[in-house]
């Protein structure tokens, strides 16, 4: 595998083969797959990301490992918020929206307390890492 799309494809295949479980960097972490359409291209994509469950909401963090830009999936979800996620063996129709303000800060702090790499991602970048919630339809 040579690029991020190849890497994602490998993680997606492993996720589906193992009922939502993957190894490598994601081993033991809660992972979901985001289906998203390219904001410009319209091309359908699938991205594996760590999530936090909060009631009926699934929350994801557009950290991109602390890079100075948001991941493509974030821009795609803002442009096309009605989508699907895969959690384990289940595919769920959801609507995506950004969480802001104190609620965003609370949720990001919770994720960072569970997975300290998220605190490191926040230290590495000048941007405020977006938190996106998926609410089942």
Walk through the language-model features, giving the residues of each.
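N-terminal short leaders/motifs
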Residues: 1-9, 36-40, 82-91
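Extreme N-terminal tail/first-helix region
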Residues: 1-30
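Short beta-strand segments
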Residues: 29-63
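Short hydrophobic/aromatic beta-strand or adjacent loop that forms the aromatic wall/cage
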Residues: 31, 128-131
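Short beta-strand element of the conserved SAM-dependent methyltransferase core
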Residues: 34, 132-136
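Short, structured beta-strand-loop surface elements
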Residues: 63-118, 124-128, 136-137
């Amino acid at each position: 595998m040579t690029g991020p799309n190849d890497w994602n494809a490998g993680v997606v295949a492993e996720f589906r083969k193992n009922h939502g479980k993957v190894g490598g960097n994601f081993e033991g972490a809660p992972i979901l797959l985001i289906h998203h359409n390219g904001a410009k291209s319209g091309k359908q994509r699938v991205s594996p990301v760590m999530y936090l469950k909060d009631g009926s909401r699934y929350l994801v963090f557009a950290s991109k490992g602390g890079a100075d830009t948001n991941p493509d999936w974030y821009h795609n979800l803002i442009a096309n918020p009605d989508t699907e996620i895969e959690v384990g063996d289940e595919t769920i129709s959801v609507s995506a929206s950004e969480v802001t303000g104190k609620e965003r800060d609370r949720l990001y702090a919770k994720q960072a307390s569970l997975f300290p790499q998220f605190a490191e991602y926040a230290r590495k970048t000048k941007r405020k890492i977006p938190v996106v919630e998926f609410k089942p339809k």
